[in-house]
């Protein structure tokens, strides 16, 4: 391990002039000690006394030397190793398992740190892998510390850790943002307790090579004196910019690696390795194949061979052959000659990796990095709540991290596969996941942490204290989902957690829908182990069950043998077993349940028969069933985590164990199927879709639609899916289509609330009980367009009790809906549930409109709002440019008329219009189908048209100003 610049004098910046030539690590340790009471420092009174930001370039030792020297503040390095350390620990978080494990092992084996012994004074703690002392320097994934902050009290955290080092703090994963929110809140609470809390308050150090120091210092309220800049690598890195961009980065990466290999044939094996970044495993496999083919050409030319090592998170978790090859010394590795089949020494390793190798990982033999410049991450689009893996150009900060993998021990070379001009055009920093994905599974944690700071005990969006708050549309969608799931309710003072919400908020990582599905399982007397299995399958299989198959050519027919391995005994001897099971279940998730049951049966069989090496036999079983062994193990682990989560909050994870679907008989099977489907429906009711026979598409209440076809089940009328996925139409073009992830057919199994699923254009019909529209017309729809400042958010509209509605206009509340499922839900959830039936957010950038009912124009008063009238379904035809125009044109006295003038609706909308405008002379027999005709009417009412658009014969948009 090379000597980092933190240990070399003269690399400090942003420090007093007299300290610029200090050894950086000495200056940092002195700076910290000056603020510790045990070293003569004052008792901390503000965050500035407990937060330090170190921006240290790659290769400086911020991940290795810094944590060790910080730990030595607590334990003298000359202390005998046999003396057990009993003080508080230092935790250093890493964004990935690989870096946490590797750093701990490297430090434990380094001659530079003889006092750091793996398992005694240094260790690692990750979800899949753990080897750590009870007290000492602990490298952990961010998720480990996040879970502790979520479940432990402030005093418990303070008694465990003296220092928290957040390495790679620039990473903007949801968990890291939430962790920083927790840390800041904890520090503030302990400081508010005075000297009692402040004496043991942990010291927080944020480190990164590309951190935005201004943003983070502003967030923590600290000044420039709390920011230390350190120069990075000691050796130069030469960047080889290409003259032209490539349209096939995988092929170009292979050609570049081969060129490097041939032109540097005299490299020493200890200074020769190549690292190539790829956005995903599919690209890694393809590039590895090309490189292995290149090895064939090298063998024919009698040139030294390359050892190809594909690395991703799965390889690390399994510690497979490729990962072991990465950790081994090059002199101990061999490669098979494709011509002679003999093994020989490779000249170099070519490591083909995802972003797991992007940060914190030091490969001392690495000399070259090839970067195609792409990054793949999940993006979610609201309010449709559709998401998927999207490949985009990596931010400059990520590219700098990739470049920083070399130049640590000797000079390195960086080969971008894009021009310098392209690099200069891409964003400097990556977008935080809370922007690209929304709050997701951490939403309830955000709610709880925000409520803690609110004296009234309510959730207010403007009080969210995060580096970047959730976007308005994502926040609106999350609130809607939480209300529908019965976890949030709207009290007199604002949004509050329900009793179920309070329980759900204690889960460390369950989403709103996952928590709701578990709660429904207890109410409907379902086997909770089945619920946990279904949720685990959804999590691991991601888009569809075929992702569990270990085959390049995946299709549903290949699942047959795996599904049949787990079905109840009474179904095993029927003809056309899989086809009939598929028809009987009509459910991807239940088929996934049976796949896992088969895997469990295999585990029990091998254990009961006392076979040697159970894992080996399970791998062979999975190969026969064409299943990925790693995926099945992940389902097992995820399922165990869910059951543990339930047990931790006091719920019985083995509730109704005897009612498992796999143990059903002919009399109980369909009843248990219906029960599980009911739980799925209640969890994912916002993702219910009805079949439109005219359009041959499935449509939902949020206006989106998609096609779905099943070879056996023909066009079911109602389906539910855990999520809507964005799937690429082709590999050549940046185009995506919507498709369901997993499908559960509800027809005949669940009593679906059709009112809840009504599309927007049918909203007036939700007001059931109106037989004679002329005598008792439905109330018109009032729409509000809000301009949001920062994170200000509130639901528009009045409660149903305030709307003076006639009894016949109230929505019929079905017997099987939310309020009847869990008896302890507060009764005001009924009102909220009713409002959600007709309240949905639709936004473009900072614009949002909300649908609700109204009686008189004067009844509705909203700050920063513009009153709009019309049918919002037609607003789908407005472009972003149209909305931008409205954003600037509309004032508090402006109106947007959005009318869908299909035949038979004119009378209803004219009636609504004359009520809204107080103008009772509009002729109801007129056929208004053109913009000029409408303009004439509104001019008579004293309005001036300022914007208009007519996308079709029956749809038009007009903005009027009074």
Curated annotation (Swiss-Prot):
InterPro entries: DEAD/DEAH_box_helicase_dom (IPR011545), DNA/RNA_helicase_DEAH_CS (IPR002464), Helicase_ATP-bd (IPR014001), Helicase_C-like (IPR001650), P-loop_NTPase (IPR027417), SAM-dependent_MTases_sf (IPR029063). GO terms for molecular function: ATP binding; ATP hydrolysis activity; RNA binding; RNA helicase activity. It is a single-pass membrane protein. Gene3D superfamilies: P-loop containing nucleotide triphosphate hydrolases (3.40.50.300), Vaccinia Virus protein VP39 (3.40.50.150). One of its GO terms (cellular component) is membrane. ATP binds at residues 56-63. It catalyses: ATP + H2O = ADP + phosphate + H(+). Keywords: ATP-binding, Helicase, Host membrane, Hydrolase, Late protein, Membrane, Nucleotide-binding, Transmembrane, Transmembrane helix, Virion. The chain crosses the membrane at residues 521-541. Induction: Expressed in the late phase of the viral replicative cycle. Residues 43-229 form the Helicase ATP-binding domain. Signal peptide: none annotated. Residues 253-459 form the Helicase C-terminal domain. Pfam families: DEAD. It is found in: Host membrane; Virion. Belongs to the DEAD box helicase family. DEAH subfamily. This is Putative RNA helicase B962L. The lineage of its organism: Viruses, Varidnaviria, Bamfordvirae, Nucleocytoviricota, Pokkesviricetes.
């Amino acid at each position: 391990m090379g000597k980092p610049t933190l240990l070399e004098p003269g690399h400090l910046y942003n420090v007093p002039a007299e300290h610029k030539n200090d050894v950086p690590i000495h200056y940092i340790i002195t700076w910290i000690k000056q603020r510790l009471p045990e070293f003569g420092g004052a008792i901390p009174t503000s965050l500035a006394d407990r937060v330090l930001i170190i921006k240290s370039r790659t290769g400086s030792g911020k991940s290795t030397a810094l944590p060790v020297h910080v730990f030595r503040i607590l334990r003298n390095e000359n202390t005998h190793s046999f003396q057990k350390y009993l003080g508080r620990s230092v935790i250093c978080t890493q964004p990935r398992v690989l870096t946490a494990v590797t750093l701990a092992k490297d430090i434990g084996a380094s001659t530079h740190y003889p006092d750091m012994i793996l398992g005694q004074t240094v260790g690692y703690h990750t979800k899949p892998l753990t080897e750590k002392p009870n007290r000492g320097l602990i490298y952990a994934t961010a998720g480990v510390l996040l879970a502790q902050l979520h479940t432990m009290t402030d005093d418990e955290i303070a008694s465990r850790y003296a220092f928290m080092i957040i390495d790679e703090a620039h990473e903007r994963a949801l968990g890291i943002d939430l962790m920083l929110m927790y840390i800041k809140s904890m520090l503030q609470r302990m400081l508010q307790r005075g000297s009692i809390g402040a004496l043991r308050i942990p010291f927080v150090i944020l480190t990164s090579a590309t951190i935005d120091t201004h943003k983070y210092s502003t967030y923590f309220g600290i000044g420039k004196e709390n920011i230390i800049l350190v120069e990075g690598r000691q050796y130069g890195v030469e960047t080889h910019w290409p003259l032209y961009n490539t349209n096939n980065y995988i092929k170009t990466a292979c050609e570049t690696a081969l060129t490097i290999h041939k032109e540097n044939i005299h490299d020493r094996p200890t200074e020769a390795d190549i690292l190539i970044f790829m956005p995903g495993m599919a690209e890694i496999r393809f590039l590895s194949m090309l490189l292995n083919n290149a090895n064939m050409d090298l063998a024919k030319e009698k040139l030294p061979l390359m050892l190809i090592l594909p690395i991703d998170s799965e390889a690390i978790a399994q510690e497979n052959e490729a990962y072991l090859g990465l950790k081994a010394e090059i002199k101990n590795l061999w490669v098979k000659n494709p011509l002679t089949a003999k093994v020989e020494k490779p000249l170099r390793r070519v490591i083909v990796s995802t972003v797991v190798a992007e940060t914190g990982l030091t490969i001392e033999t690495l000399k070259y990095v090839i970067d195609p410049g792409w990054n793949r991450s999940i993006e979610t689009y609201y309010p449709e709540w559709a998401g998927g893996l999207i490949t985009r150009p990596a931010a400059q900060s990520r590219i700098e991290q990739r470049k920083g993998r070399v130049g640590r021990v000797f000079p390195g070379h960086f080969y971008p596969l894009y021009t310098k001009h392209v690099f200069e055009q891409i964003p400097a920093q990556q977008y935080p996941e809370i922007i690209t994905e929304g709050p997701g599974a951490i939403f309830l944690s955000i709610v709880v942490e925000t409520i803690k700071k609110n004296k009234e005990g309510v959730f207010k969006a403007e009080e969210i204290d995060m580096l970047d708050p959730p976007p308005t549309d994502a926040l609106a969608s999350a609130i809607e989902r939480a209300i529908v799931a019965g976890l949030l309710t709207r009290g007199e003072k604002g949004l509050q957690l329900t009793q179920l919400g309070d329980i759900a908020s204690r889960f460390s990582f369950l989403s709103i829908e996952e928590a709701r599905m578990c709660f429904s399982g207890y109410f409907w007397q379902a086997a909770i182990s089945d619920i946990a299995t279904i949720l685990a399958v959804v999590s691991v299989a991601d888009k569809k069950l075929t992702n569990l198959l270990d085959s390049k050519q995946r299709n549903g027919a290949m699942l047959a043998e795996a599904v049949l391995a787990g079905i109840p005994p009474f179904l095993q001897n029927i003809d056309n077993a899989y086809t009939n099971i598929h028809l009987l279940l009509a459910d991807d998730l239940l088929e996934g349940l049976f796949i896992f049951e088969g895997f469990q049966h295999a585990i029990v069989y091998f254990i009961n028969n006392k076979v040697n090496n159970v894992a080996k036999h399970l791998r062979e079983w999975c190969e026969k069933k064409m299943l990925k062994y790693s995926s099945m193990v992940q389902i097992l682990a995820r399922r165990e985590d869910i059951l543990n989560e339930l047990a931790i909050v006091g719920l019985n994870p083995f509730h109704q164990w005897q009612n498992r679907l796999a143990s059903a008989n002919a009399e109980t099977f369909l009843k248990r199927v219906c029960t599980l489907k009911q739980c799925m429906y209640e969890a994912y009711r916002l993702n219910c879709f009805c079949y439109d026979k005219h359009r041959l598409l499935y449509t939902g209440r949020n206006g989106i639609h998609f096609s779905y076809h099943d070879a056996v089940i023909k066009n079911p009328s109602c389906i539910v899916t855990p999520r809507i996925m964005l799937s690429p139409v082709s590999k050549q073009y940046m185009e995506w289509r919507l498709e369901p992830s997993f499908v559960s057919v509800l027809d005949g199994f669940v009593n679906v609330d059709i009112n809840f699923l009504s599309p927007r254009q049918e909203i007036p019909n939700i007001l059931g009980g109106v037989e004679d529209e002329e005598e008792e017309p439905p109330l018109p729809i009032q729409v509000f367009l809000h301009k949001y400042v920062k994170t200000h958010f509130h639901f528009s509209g009045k409660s149903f009790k305030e709307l003076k509605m006639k009894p016949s206009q109230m929505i019929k509340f079905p017997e099987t809906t939310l309020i009847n499922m869990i008896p302890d839900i507060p009764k005001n959830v009924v009102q909220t549930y009713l409002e959600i039936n007709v309240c949905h957010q639709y936004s473009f950038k900072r614009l949002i409109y909300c649908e609700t009912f109204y009686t008189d124009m004067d009844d509705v008063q909203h700050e920063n709002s513009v009153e709009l009238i019309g049918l919002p379904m037609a607003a789908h035809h407005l472009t972003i440019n149209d909305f931008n125009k409205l954003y600037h044109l509309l004032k508090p006295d402006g109106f947007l008329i959005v009318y869908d003038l299909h035949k038979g609706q004119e009378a209803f909308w004219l009636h609504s219009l004359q009520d809204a405008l107080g103008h009772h002379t509009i002729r109801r027999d007129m056929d208004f189908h053109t913009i000029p005709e409408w303009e004439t009417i509104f001019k008579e009412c004293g309005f001036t048209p300022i914007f208009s658009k007519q996308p079709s014969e029956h749809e038009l948009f007009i903005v009027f100003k009074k």
